[in-house]
C-alpha cells in the first residue's frame, strides 16, 4: 500500500516535486517545480538494487521495435523556456521520443514511456535537465574551442573562420566555397553540431550566392570587410532569396553612414545584430538603438555580461588585439576607446532583463570566451535580480519567469534566429536529444553530463583506475560519444537548403549527417521566446546615457559575482 513520507525524504529519493524550490548554484535565483508528470505518487520509476526498474516491475517485456525507448532519463527537473517541471524523458533514435511518465504499462498506470530490456537508464533524480546550449557567434580560430564549449554545456556552434588567419581572428566568416568545404570536412571529427557562415560583404550577389550554394547556412557582414549600405542591401537580398540568416557587425567609425543609414539599408528585413550594445563593434555610440526595431534580432557577446568593475579595463586591451590595432597609432587608440562605454554596457544589463536583448553568445577568442556563455548568462540574471528585484511577470515565491527568459537566450532564441529550432533549442518531443544534466549546486558552471544525439559525449568522471567511478580527481572528461564513428552519428552539420538539395554531403564526402536551415526570413523579435520587448531607445550623444521609452537605464557594476572563483579553485 502507498505510504506517506516526509517531503524531504521524497525529494532525497526521487528529486523535488510540485511546489518544491531549488536554488541554482550559488546565485540568488530560485526555481519552483510547476508540475510533476512522473506520478501518480508511488508509481515513480528508479533504477538500482531493490528499486523499480527491474524485469516484470518497472521494466516491461516490450522490444525496441514494439515501442520501448533506447534511453530513459528518470525523474529529471526540466528547466526550459517551455516551463520548469519534473518528468521522465524517453530518447529514441537520438531524439526526444516522449516526455512524461516512464515504466511498464503492464503493471503501472499512465505510462507514456515504455522501459524495456533494451532501455538504458540515466538517473535524473535531484538533477536539472536543460537543452544543450547554442553559441551563434563563433570565430573558428582553433578547434580546441569545441572541447571547452562542449564541457561547458554547449552542443551547437555557428560562426565562421578557417583557423588563426587574420581574417578569422577578427571576423566570423568562412570566405568562399573552398574554405567552406575544408571546414565542413573538418567538422566530421568533432562531437558538436557545427554550422558555418560565409562572408556577406559584397555589393554584387554572385560571390555571396556561391558561398550559400557551397554550404554556408548564414552570412556575416563585418565592418572590417566594409559594412556599407550597399553591402547590407545586397547581402540581405541574397539571404531573402536563399533563406539564410544574416549577422551584422556595423560601422563603428561611421565612415559609410550612421546607425540611421544602416537601418534604412536593412529595409525592414530580418537580421541578427551581433553585440548590439557596441563594445564588440558597431556604430558609436548609439548602435544599441536598433534593439528597438522589430525586425532586428539583438544579441550580446559575453565579455560585457554582466557589467562589473573590471569590464571597462579589460575591454581596451582585448579590442586592440582582436582588431589588429596598434597602440602607437593615436587613431587606433581612439577607435578602441570609442567602442567601450560604461553607460551603454550598464544599459545592456537592464535591456536583457526587460527582454529587449534576446540572445547571448560568445565571440570566441575574438572578444569573447567560448566556455562562458552559460555562466555569464546566469551571472547577468543574478545581478539583475539583486539590483532590480522581482520581475512583474513573476508569480509565487520563485524566479521561474526570469529563469525561463534567460535560458531562452542561449537555447531556443538563437535556434529560431538561425532556422534550426525544429531540430534543437528546447526540450520538446521530436527534437534532437542534445541535452545537459546538471547537479543544482553546479548549475550553469560544470555540467554533470552532456548528451549529443542521445549519446553521452562528456561527463564528470573520477579516476579511471579506481574501483568505482567517483574517486578524485573528478572532472569533465570525454565519453564514448566523443570518439570514433559515434561522433559522425551523434552530431550534425547545418547547411543551407540550396546546398542540402544539391547533395553537399555526398559532394564533399562528409560522414556527418547534414541538415538544412529553414524559416530564417520574415521573422521578427516577436517570433523569439520571452524576449520580445521593442522599447524606443535614445542615446545621449555626449554623455552616452541610454533611455528606453524615456526611462534612464543605469545600474552599478558588480563587485562580486556568483559562479566564479568558488567553482574554479584549481
From Swiss-Prot:
Please list the cofactors this protein needs. Ni cation
Compartment list? Cytoplasm
User: Which positions bind substrate?
Assistant: 222
Where in this protein does the record say N6-carboxylysine is found? 220
Question: Which InterPro entries does the UniProt record give?
Answer: Amidohydro-rel, Metal-dep_hydrolase_composite, Metal_Hydrolase, Urease_alpha_N_dom, Urease_alpha_subunit, Urease_AS, Urease_asu, Urease_asu_c
What are the BP-aspect GO terms? urea catabolic process
Q: Which Gene3D superfamilies match?
A: Metal-dependent hydrolases, Urease, subunit C, domain 1
**Entry keyword Nucleus:** no
Give the SUPFAM superfamilies listed for this entry.
Composite domain of metallo-dependent hydrolases, Metallo-dependent hydrolases
Q: Which major enzyme category is it?
A: hydrolase
Task: Report the co-factor binding details.
Answer: Binds 2 nickel ions per subunit.
**What kind of modification does the protein receive after translation?**
Carboxylation allows a single lysine to coordinate two nickel ions.
Q: What is its main location?
A: cytoplasm
Alphabetized UniProt keyword annotations: Cytoplasm, Hydrolase, Metal-binding, Nickel
| Alphabetized HAMAP family for the sequence | Urease_alpha
Q: Which family does it belong to?
A: Belongs to the metallo-dependent hydrolases superfamily. Urease alpha subunit family.
Under which name does UniProt file this protein?
Urease subunit alpha
UniProt source species: Ruegeria sp. (strain TM1040) (Silicibacter sp.)
- Tell me the name of the encoding gene: ureC
Amino acid at each position: 500500500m502507498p505510504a506517506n513520507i516526509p517531503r524531504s525524504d521524497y525529494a532525497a529519493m526521487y528529486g523535488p516535486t510540485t511546489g518544491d524550490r531549488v536554488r541554482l548554484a550559488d546565485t540568488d535565483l530560485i526555481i519552483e517545480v510547476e508540475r510533476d508528470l512522473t506520478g501518480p505518487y508511488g508509481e515513480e520509476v528508479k533504477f538500482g538494487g531493490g528499486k523499480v526498474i527491474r524485469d516484470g516491475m518497472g521494466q516491461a517485456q516490450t522490444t525496441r521495435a514494439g515501442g520501448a525507448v533506447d534511453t530513459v532519463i528518470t525523474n529529471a527537473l526540466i528547466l526550459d523556456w517551455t516551463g520548469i517541471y519534473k518528468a521522465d524523458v524517453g530518447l529514441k533514435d537520438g531524439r526526444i521520443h516522449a516526455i512524461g511518465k516512464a515504466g511498464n504499462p503492464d503493471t503501472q498506470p499512465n505510462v507514456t514511456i515504455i522501459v524495456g530490456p533494451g532501455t538504458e537508464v540515466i538517473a535524473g533524480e535531484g538533477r536539472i535537465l536543460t537543452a544543450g546550449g547554442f553559441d551563434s557567434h563563433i570565430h573558428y580560430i582553433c578547434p580546441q574551442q569545441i572541447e571547452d564549449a562542449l564541457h561547458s554545456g554547449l552542443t551547437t556552434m555557428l560562426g565562421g573562420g578557417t583557423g588563426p588567419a587574420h581574417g578569422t581572428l577578427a571576423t566570423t566568416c568562412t570566405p568562399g566555397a573552398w574554405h567552406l568545404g575544408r571546414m565542413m570536412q573538418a567538422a566530421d571529427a568533432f562531437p558538436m553540431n557545427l554550422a558555418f557562415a560565409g562572408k556577406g560583404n559584397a555589393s554584387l550577389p554572385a560571390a555571396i550566392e556561391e558561398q550559400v550554394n557551397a554550404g554556408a547556412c548564414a552570412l556575416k557582414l563585418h565592418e572590417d570587410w566594409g559594412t556599407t549600405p550597399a553591402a547590407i542591401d545586397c547581402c540581405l537580398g541574397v539571404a531573402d532569396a536563399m533563406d539564410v540568416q544574416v549577422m551584422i557587425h556595423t560601422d563603428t567609425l561611421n565612415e559609410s553612414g550612421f546607425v540611421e543609414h544602416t537601418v534604412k539599408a536593412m529595409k525592414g528585413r530580418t537580421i541578427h545584430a551581433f553585440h548590439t550594445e557596441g563594445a564588440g563593434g558597431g556604430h558609436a555610440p548609439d548602435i544599441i538603438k536598433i534593439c528597438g526595431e522589430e525586425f532586428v534580432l539583438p544579441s550580446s557577446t559575453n565579455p560585457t555580461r554582466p557589467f562589473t568593475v573590471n569590464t571597462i579595463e579589460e575591454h581596451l586591451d582585448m579590442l586592440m588585439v582582436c582588431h589588429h590595432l596598434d597602440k602607437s597609432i593615436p587613431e587606433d587608440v581612439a577607435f578602441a576607446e570609442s567602442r567601450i562605454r560604461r553607460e551603454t554596457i550598464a544599459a545592456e544589463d537592464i535591456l536583457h532583463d526587460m527582454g529587449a536583448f534576446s540572445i547571448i553568445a560568445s565571440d570566441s577568442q575574438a572578444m569573447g570566451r567560448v566556455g562562458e556563455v552559460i555562466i555569464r548568462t546566469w551571472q547577468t540574471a543574478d545581478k539583475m535580480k539583486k539590483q532590480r528585484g522581482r520581475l512583474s511577470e513573476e508569480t509565487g515565491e520563485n524566479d521561474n519567469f526570469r529563469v525561463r527568459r534567460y535560458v531562452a537566450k542561449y537555447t531556443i532564441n538563437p535556434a529560431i534566429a538561425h532556422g534550426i529550432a525544429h531540430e534543437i533549442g528546447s526540450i520538446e518531443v521530436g527534437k534532437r536529444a542534445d541535452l545537459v544534466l546538471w547537479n543544482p549546486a553546479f548549475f550553469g558552471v560544470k555540467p554533470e553530463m552532456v548528451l549529443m544525439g542521445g549519446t553521452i559525449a562528456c561527463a564528470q568522471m573520477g579516476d579511471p583506475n579506481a574501483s568505482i567511478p567517483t574517486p578524485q580527481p573528478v572532472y569533465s572528461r570525454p565519453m564514448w560519444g566523443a570518439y570514433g564513428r559515434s561522433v559522425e552519428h551523434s552530431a550534425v552539420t547545418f547547411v543551407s537548403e540550396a546546398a542540402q538539395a544539391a547533395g553537399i554531403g555526398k559532394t564533399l564526402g562528409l560522414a556527418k549527417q547534414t541538415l538544412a536551415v529553414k524559416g530564417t526570413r520574415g521573422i521578427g523579435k516577436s517570433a523569439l521566446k520571452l524576449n520580445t520587448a521593442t522599447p524606443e531607445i535614445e542615446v545621449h550623444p555626449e554623455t552616452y546615457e541610454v533611455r528606453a521609452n524615456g526611462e534612464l537605464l543605469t545600474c552599478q557594476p558588480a563587485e562580486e559575482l556568483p559562479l566564479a572563483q568558488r567553482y574554479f579553485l584549481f
